[in-house]
Amino acid sequence: MLSLNTGSDQTGFTIIELLIVALIIGILLAVAIPKLFVARFSANEANTRKAMQTLRDGESLYFEQDLDDDGLRNYTSQIGNITTGGTLRCPPSGGNCTEEDSLVDSTFEGAVSTGALADCVDPKAGYCIQFASDVDATDPLTLQAEYGWKASMTSARKTGRRDFAVYADGVIRCALSQEVIGDPGAFQADRTSNACDD
């Protein structure tokens, strides 16, 4: 005799079960994604603060040890490259240095921005770096205000939230970016900005 299969022994998930699983995954993503952005911002900003410390320490060595061999205790305003003398990458004024001569590593070279906005070839952890235009070099006998470096994010509130600056006083300063989300940063931290808190 012929029997009909009523489908009662079929296996699989019902539409309700699938919707519940999708809902749970959606809730988990809604909680996790903002935390991932915060972690990314924190990592980029920590890396940039370290870069500011490296520039500060490099400038101090350049000054104290007269690494450009010009007989003057002065700073440099250039990151440069391994063949350009009188820079943080190649302190001796003659140029043609080795990595051992360098005060900063090669990742600084592509991170240099020369305009008003953070636009560089190879950002360092989402940030561009530039020599501060508000440096006061009127008194060559003091350490105060002889150099300054700034860092700003390439995409505001996507790669970071704060801009950074460091001057001859050695204090790393921060300013919360006021740029529109996604716009390049405008190097808003300066010598009047508050010191960064940990």
Residue positions per predicted region:
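N-terminal leader/signal peptides at the extreme start of proteins
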Residues: 1-13
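Secretory/exported precursors with cleavable N-terminal leaders
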Residues: 12-20
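Alpha-helical hydrophobic helix detector
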Residues: 19-35
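Aliphatic-rich helix starts adjacent to a transmembrane/signal segment
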Residues: 35-52
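Extracellular/periplasmic head regions of type IV pilus-like filament subunits
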Residues: 57-162, 168-169, 176, 194-198
